[in-house]
Each structure stands twice: as structure tokens, then as C-alpha cells.
Amino acid sequence: MATYARSVERLIAELSRLPTIGPRSAQRIAFHIIRTRKEEALALAEALREVKERIRPCRRCFNLTEGEECDICRDPRRDRSVICVVEDPYDIGPIERTGEYRGLYHVLGGALSPLDGVEPEDLRIAELVERVRSEGTRELILATNPNTTGEATAMFIAQEVRELPVRVTALASGLPVGGDLEYADEVTLGRAFAGRREL
């Protein structure tokens, strides 16, 4: 027997499918939505609809954008000879907030994880290698997460571009092992960029 009305149970179930949202958090969010004014709840629903209709990957770096290219790729002030490789679009925000980096990005779409069935062809590694070849990239900064899958991904990419005339670096230590870039504070991340090491 359901505890709540069918529509409430459905909302809780859908919210529970989001990453890091368990059943109790989903229930709290659902009841928060129910308590808000109708206009606020509908604004949230409209924002969800809009993002699903408008957002797509940048054709160049695979960051999120509403157009063909993201704002970073379109910015003529960016250093086009340097590409920072990240796992996911949400890794770009913390790096940008450091103010230490003015190059371009490449979003892989995850990290290698054979146990989870994520192989090199499942990521945008081939597209990265092609960019390095065709865009005259001088430096490739591998800013994958400091965990087992991130490190394996960085080492794989370093091997893939070893014959190309590009400097390959990784962020310096200071980031917690096993952590994710999205949770790193700007000072630590800025120092990791400033002290990056050759691979």
C-alpha cells in the first residue's frame, strides 16, 4: 500500500533516480516542491524542460552549450594552444573559478572503467587526439579526477598522444586522492594548476 498519493509517490521515485539523492532526500525535496507556490514549482518544471530541449554538447570541446560552440570555445581571448582535459562538464566550473587557466577544454564524457564497461571508444578520446593533431596544441593538461579511474584515463591519454609534438601535464598533488574536481576548493585547485607535472 502506498504511503502517499500516487502523484507524490511518482515524484519521490523520479527524484530518487538522481545521483546522490536517496529516498529520504527525495521525499524532502518532493514535499518542499509541494509546499512552494504553484508558480515556483512550474518554473522548476519549465527550467527542466528548457534545459532538455536546448542544451547540447559543444561541437568542438563537448562542454554544454545552447549553440554550436560553447562560450569558452568562442572566446577569442582564450589560449588555443592549450587544452585542459576533464571528465565531465561540471569539472569546468571549479577550474574556471580559480582564474589560473585561460586555455580551452575537452570533455571526455567520463573515465575509463573496464569493470563498469567503460572502454576508450566510449569516451571522446579519439576526438581529443584529432584536436591535438589538427589544432596545433602545445600543451595537454590532464585534469581527470584523482582516483583510480581518473588516473588510468590520464595514463591512457598520455600513451595515445606520446608520438605527437605536445607537452602532456597533469595537475599537481594537493587534490585529495579518490576525490572529485567538482568538490575541490578554488585555492587548492589553483595551486594544482600552477604546479602541474609532466607525464
UniProtKB/Swiss-Prot annotation:
Keywords: DNA damage, DNA recombination, DNA repair, Metal-binding, Zinc, Zinc-finger
Zinc fingers classed as C4-type: ranges: 58-73
GO molecular function terms noted in the UniProt entry: DNA binding; zinc ion binding
Domain Toprim: 81-176
Entry keyword annotation includes Endoplasmic reticulum: no
A Pfam family that the UniProt record links to this protein: RecR_ZnF
Single biological process term from Gene Ontology: DNA recombination
Source species, domain of life: Bacteria
Record PROSITE patterns: RECR, TOPRIM
Coiled-coil segments: none
This protein's record includes keyword Ribonucleoprotein: no
Function: May play a role in DNA repair. It seems to be involved in an RecBC-independent recombinational process of DNA repair. It may act with RecF and RecO.
Annotated HAMAP family: RecR
Family: Belongs to the RecR family.
Record's protein name: Recombination protein RecR
Organism of derivation: Rubrobacter xylanophilus (strain DSM 9941 / JCM 11954 / NBRC 16129 / PRD-1)
